[in-house]
Amino acid sequence: MSLKNSLVIYGGSFNPPHNGHIIIAQLVREMFRFADFHVVTSSTPPHKKVDVSFKERFFLTKKAFEKVEGITVSDIEHRLGGVSYAINTIEYYEKKYSHIFFLVGEDALYSIEKWYRYEDILKKAHMLVYPRFKDELVYKKVERVLESLSNSIYILKLPLIQISSTVVRERAIKGLSLYGFVPQHIISYVEEIYGNR
C-alpha cells in the first residue's frame, strides 16, 4: 500500500494538554514523517463530561503544540458541531486524504466496540495504539477485538509515559507545581484555568 497522502489524527479532550501528549505526538510524528499530523481537540466528547470549555482547551492545546514542528492543531470537531464522534472526524478528513491513521491510548481500545459506528471507524482508518499501562495482562481484554480486526489495529512500541490530565488538574487545584507536567510556557494559563475550580 502506498502511504502518500496520509494523515495521522491524534484526538482527545486535552483537558488540559500535558507533556505526555507532546512526547507521544513527537514520537509518532517521527515514525510517520510521510504523513500530515493533526491534533484534534474534542468539542463535545461522547464518553466523558468536560467542565472546561472547548475554547479554553483549544487555546491551551494550540499553545502547548505551537513549538512542535510538523503538527497542526485542529478545531474541526467544533466546526462540525454536535457530539464529537471519531467517525465524523474521519469522514471529514477522508475527502482529502487517501489513508487515515487514528492515534489512541490503549485504554480506548478496551471499549472500542462501544464507540459510535466503530466498525466503520476500523474500515476507514488504521488505529495506532500507544501504551498507557505496564500490565501485560491488559491485552487479554481486547484479544478478541485484535484477532478479528488485526488489519486495522497497530500496537506501537513506545515508552510508557506516566502523566495524565487528571493528575495535572488535581495538582493545579491543590496549587502544586506543574513544572515538568505541562510545557513551561503554558503553566500560568493552566494554573489560571484549572486552579480556580
Swiss-Prot record:
Q: Which reaction does it catalyse?
A: nicotinate beta-D-ribonucleotide + ATP + H(+) = deamido-NAD(+) + diphosphate
What EC number(s) does its UniProt record assign? 2.7.7.18
Return the broad EC class: transferase
Q: Which CDD domains match?
A: NMNAT (cd02165)
Q: Which GO terms describe its biological process?
A: NAD biosynthetic process
Molecular functions per Gene Ontology:
ATP binding; nicotinate-nucleotide adenylyltransferase activity
SUPFAM superfamilies linked to this entry: Nucleotidylyl transferase
Question: Which pathway is it part of?
Answer: Cofactor biosynthesis; NAD(+) biosynthesis; deamido-NAD(+) from nicotinate D-ribonucleotide: step 1/1
- Highest taxon listed in the record's lineage: Bacteria
**Keywords, in A-Z order:** ATP-binding, NAD, Nucleotide-binding, Nucleotidyltransferase, Pyridine nucleotide biosynthesis, Transferase
Q: Name the InterPro entries on file.
A: Cyt_trans-like, NadD/NMNAT, Rossmann-like_a/b/a_fold
Task: Quote any Pfam family the record assigns.
Answer: CTP_transf_like
- Membership in a protein family: Belongs to the NadD family.
Q: What does this protein do?
A: Catalyzes the reversible adenylation of nicotinate mononucleotide (NaMN) to nicotinic acid adenine dinucleotide (NaAD).
Name of the protein in its database record: Probable nicotinate-nucleotide adenylyltransferase
What organism is recorded for this protein?
Thermosipho melanesiensis (strain DSM 12029 / CIP 104789 / BI429)
Encoding gene (name): nadD
